[in-house]
UniProtKB/Swiss-Prot annotation:
GO terms for molecular function: structural constituent of ribosome. The keyword Cell membrane does not apply. It comes from Pseudomonas putida (strain ATCC 47054 / DSM 6125 / CFBP 8728 / NCIMB 11950 / KT2440). The keyword tRNA processing does not apply. This is Large ribosomal subunit protein bL35. It comes from the Bacteria. Keywords: Ribonucleoprotein, Ribosomal protein. GO terms for biological process: translation. Belongs to the bacterial ribosomal protein bL35 family. InterPro entries: Ribosomal_bL35, Ribosomal_bL35-like, Ribosomal_bL35_CS, Ribosomal_bL35_sf. GO terms for cellular component: cytosolic large ribosomal subunit.
Length: 64
């Protein structure tokens, strides 16, 4: 039986770390002039995936 392929879109967006999955914040790509400086600052950097979404991402990346 052939190997299962990972979802390539998910592989580009999530990175497995020891403490979970790292991901970039949404709403930070274009048309940022309307957004306040505070909101843009809060969306900077990466964050860990919420525990309720971990099972879905593991299935997409075939981690288990």
């Amino acid at each position: 039986m052939p190997k299962m392929k990972t979802k390539s879109g998910a592989a580009k967006r999530f990175l497995k770390t020891a403490s979970g999955f790292k991901h970039k914040h949404a709403f930070k790509s274009h048309i940022l002039t309307k957004m306040s400086t505070k909101r843009k600052r809060q969306l900077r950097g990466a964050s860990l995936l919420h525990p309720s979404d971990v099972a879905k991402v593991e299935r997409m990346l075939r981690v288990r």
